[in-house]
């Protein structure tokens, strides 16, 4: 099973790339974590935010692998503990499909992305900068994987 992290925004600061890459390299070969960046639409004083969201959503959905399970990261989503995320990871593996996790831009995800999702995950009720979300998701998934394989990274 491959996990795609599809995120709106490019040209992240070095600390984001370093942090994400640290967890990405730890994933096993049979469950690689891949980052796909979608360019954010130009936001300005007179920007049509609905149109920007729509375009970002179209690009994000086009990047999703065929037959992949789509999971959005969104506030109304489920708030999983680490053991619950580990159970989700196992369930996704049993399903046999790849997983595409969608992270929106400053205004979130398009209605089309939300409608296409089979699940929605609320990472936190806190507002986080989108660059940080990439690292937190990568670490959370790695921690969940370590729990499912009895790897010593996660401790109760």
UniProtKB/Swiss-Prot annotation:
Q: Which InterPro entries match?
A: Alpha/beta_knot_MTases (IPR029028), RlmH-like (IPR003742), tRNA_m1G_MTases_N (IPR029026)
Keyword set for this entry? Cytoplasm, Methyltransferase, rRNA processing, S-adenosyl-L-methionine, Transferase
Could you list the residue ranges that cross the membrane?
A: none
- Compartments in which it is found: Cytoplasm
- Give start-end ranges for the coiled-coil region(s): none
Where mainly located? cytoplasm
Q: Does the keyword Transferase apply?
A: yes
The EC number(s) this enzyme carries = 2.1.1.177
* MF annotations from Gene Ontology: rRNA (pseudouridine-N3-)-methyltransferase activity
May I have one GO cellular component term? cytoplasm
Could you give the subunit structure recorded for this chain? Homodimer.
Cited HAMAP family = 23SrRNA_methyltr_H (MF_00658)
Which family does the entry's similarity section mention?
Belongs to the RNA methyltransferase RlmH family.
Protein name, UniProt field: Ribosomal RNA large subunit methyltransferase H
Q: Which organism is it from?
A: Tolumonas auensis (strain DSM 9187 / NBRC 110442 / TA 4)
What is the primary gene name for this protein? rlmH
């Amino acid at each position: 099973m491959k996990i795609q992290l599809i995120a709106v925004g490019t040209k992240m600061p070095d600390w984001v790339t370093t942090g994400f890459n640290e967890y990405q390299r730890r994933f096993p070969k049979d469950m690689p974590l891949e980052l796909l960046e979608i360019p954010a639409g130009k936001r300005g004083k007179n920007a049509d935010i609905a149109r920007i969201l729509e375009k970002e959503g179209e690009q994000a959905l086009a990047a999703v692998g065929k037959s992949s399970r789509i999971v959005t990261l969104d506030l109304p989503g489920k708030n999983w503990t680490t053991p619950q995320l580990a159970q989700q990871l196992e369930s996704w593996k049993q399903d046999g499909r790849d997983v595409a996790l969608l992270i929106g831009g400053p205004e979130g995800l398009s209605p089309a992305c939300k409608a296409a999702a089979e699940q929605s995950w609320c990472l936190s009720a806190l507002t986080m900068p989108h660059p940080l979300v990439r690292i937190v998701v990568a670490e959370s998934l790695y921690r969940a994987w370590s729990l499912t394989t009895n790897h010593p990274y996660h401790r109760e």
